[in-house]
């Protein structure tokens, strides 16, 4: 881990503010050839054309995720959803469609520029059951037991206090609530030089939890029915792309990264008030 996580948080904020301004002013996609660090190949081809239909182009262009948590979350009409680190709002808008007018979709983000972009995207999408909140995922500004489902898209890995994030997620979920997150996860030993690199932390790699650690931290927070399903394992060419331009010996380190990082669906459930764990309908 980098020695000063406040510096990392500040760089993360600057990166996402820059991405939001780039989209808002008509710049290229964050995920295109002029991508910011960590934007590609993690963020490519996450949503299908049917999902994108009717969404503002700016919501798609600002997407910096590593999966599609709305496809994972099995949302139902009337539910309340919270997206941790909502960025330009794409997953919040998709969730709002799924939960319908009797439901609610919250987005939480710490970056003013992303919040402004997300609210503009909400206006363009014409969705009233959406609210974007300013705050940090380590201190969620919602009451206990207020949310049915928590989603997040390649954001938890950015936090320097993941235990606190998961405890906060558990706190705001209703009994029986669901945790359905896309994140970058590791499997096997990762070189310490990569773990300490600030740019790779900001790029969603250095801060990624080991698969077993993720499960253990979720369990320690109180969750049950924990599972992690890899959706894309990054190969050596992906590793080279991640490392290029970071001041790192690409030839030496890329082979050590091969098949050790993956995008995954992370699922968990908060036990019910009686301690029972609701059956998961699918998967």
Curated annotation (Swiss-Prot):
Q: Could you list this entry's UniProt keywords, alphabetically sorted.
A: Arsenical resistance, Methyltransferase, S-adenosyl-L-methionine, Transferase
The Gene Ontology biological process terms listed for this entry are: methylation; response to arsenic-containing substance
Can you state which reaction this protein catalyses? arsenic triglutathione + [thioredoxin]-dithiol + S-adenosyl-L-methionine + 2 H2O = methylarsonous acid + [thioredoxin]-disulfide + 3 glutathione + S-adenosyl-L-homocysteine + H(+); arsenic triglutathione + 2 [thioredoxin]-dithiol + 2 S-adenosyl-L-methionine + H2O = dimethylarsinous acid + 2 [thioredoxin]-disulfide + 3 glutathione + 2 S-adenosyl-L-homocysteine + 2 H(+); arsenic triglutathione + 3 [thioredoxin]-dithiol + 3 S-adenosyl-L-methionine = trimethylarsine + 3 [thioredoxin]-disulfide + 3 glutathione + 3 S-adenosyl-L-homocysteine + 3 H(+)
* EC numbers, comma separated: 2.1.1.137
Q: Where are the transmembrane segments?
A: none
Q: What are this entry's molecular-function GO terms?
A: arsenite methyltransferase activity
The record, for Pfam families, names: Methyltransf_31 (PF13847)
SUPFAM superfamilies in the record: S-adenosyl-L-methionine-dependent methyltransferases
What's the stated role of this polypeptide?
Answer: Catalyzes the transfer of a methyl group from AdoMet to arsenite, producing methylated arsenicals. Involved in the conversion of As(III) to a number of di- and trimethylated species, with trimethylarsine as the end product. Reduces the arsenic toxicity in the cell and may contribute to the global arsenic cycling.
- Protein family according to the UniProt entry: Belongs to the methyltransferase superfamily. Arsenite methyltransferase family.
Q: What name does UniProt use for this protein? A: Arsenite methyltransferase
Q: Which organism is it from?
A: Rhodopseudomonas palustris (strain ATCC BAA-98 / CGA009)
């Amino acid at each position: 881990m980098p020695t000063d996580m406040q510096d990392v948080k500040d760089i993360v904020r600057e990166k996402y503010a820059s991405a939001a301004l780039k989209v808002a002013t008509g710049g290229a996609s964050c995920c295109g050839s002029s991508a910011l660090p960590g934007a590609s190949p993690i963020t490519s081809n996450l949503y299908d054309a049917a999902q994108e239909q009717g969404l503002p182009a700016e919501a798609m262009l600002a997407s910096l995720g590593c999966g599609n948590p709305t496809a994972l979350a099995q949302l139902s009409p009337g539910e309340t959803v919270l997206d941790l680190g909502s960025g330009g709002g794409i997953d919040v808008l998709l969730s709002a469609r799924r939960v319908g007018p009797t439901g609610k979709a919250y987005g939480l983000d710490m970056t003013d520029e992303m919040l402004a972009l997300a609210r503009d995207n909400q206006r363009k999408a014409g969705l009233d059951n959406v609210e974007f909140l300013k705050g940090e995922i380590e201190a969620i500004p919602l009451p206990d037991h207020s949310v049915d489902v928590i989603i997040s898209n390649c954001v938890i890995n950015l936090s320097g206090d993941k235990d606190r994030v998961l405890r906060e997620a558990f706190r705001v979920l209703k009994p029986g609530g669901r945790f359905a997150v896309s994140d970058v996860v590791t499997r096997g030993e990762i070189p310490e030089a990569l773990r300490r690199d600030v740019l790779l932390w900001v790029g969603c790699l250095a801060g990624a939890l080991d698969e077993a650690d993720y499960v253990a931290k979720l369990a320690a927070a109180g969750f049950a029915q924990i599972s992690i399903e890899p959706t894309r394992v990054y190969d050596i060419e992906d590793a080279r792309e991640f490392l290029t331009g970071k001041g790192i010996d690409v030839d030496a380190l890329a082979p050590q990264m091969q098949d050790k990082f993956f995008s995954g669906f992370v699922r968990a459930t908060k036990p019910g008030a009686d301690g029972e764990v609701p059956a998961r309908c699918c998967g």
